[in-house]
Amino acid sequence: MDENKKTEGLNLQPQALEAEEAVLGSMMIDEDAANKAVSILGSSHHFYKDSHKKIFEAMLVLMNNSDPIDTVSVSDELKKSKHLKSVGGIYYLTGLVDKVPTSARVETYAEIVKEKGMLRDLIITSHEISKKALDAGDSVGSILDEAEQSIFSLTEQKDSKIYQHIEPISVSYTHLTLPTSYPV
């Protein structure tokens, strides 16, 4: 069978698996990179690959508990949630770290992951709008209002950053601070 005929009609969703891997690897080698990635992505929603979603979710659990994020702790958290094997095991996690020589570009990679996730959301939203327009059960004004709300919520997502409470973050920087009478 001709290769073109095999893939004809196959619509691949927008994705950047290399950027996803770079984000996850960067998060395991640098705590600041982990904070930056989480502030951009917020949740695992923007990841395309399910195993990457699970790894990111394990990292979020570790961050929320103020635990370090590295291959050992992520592996342990994935074991607890019974996802270690399904994500590829400890070898996959160490492979993610090995693929990233530095975490310096984590923000760029996280933005790419977020952008691809938003494109997938836009495709889903536009498909839902098309279905409503074809059904024509509602008035045109109602369909336009819903379409506008859906698109607006995607637009808000574009510029949103996730903010974290200062206390868990400040714990890792206590060695750099001066004691004062002000509470943390």
Regions found by a protein language model. Name each.
Residues 174-180:
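Conserved small/polar residues in nucleotide/adenosyl-binding loops
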Residues 90-156, 160:
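Extended, charged alpha-helical coiled-coil/arm scaffolds that mediate oligomerization and mechanical coupling
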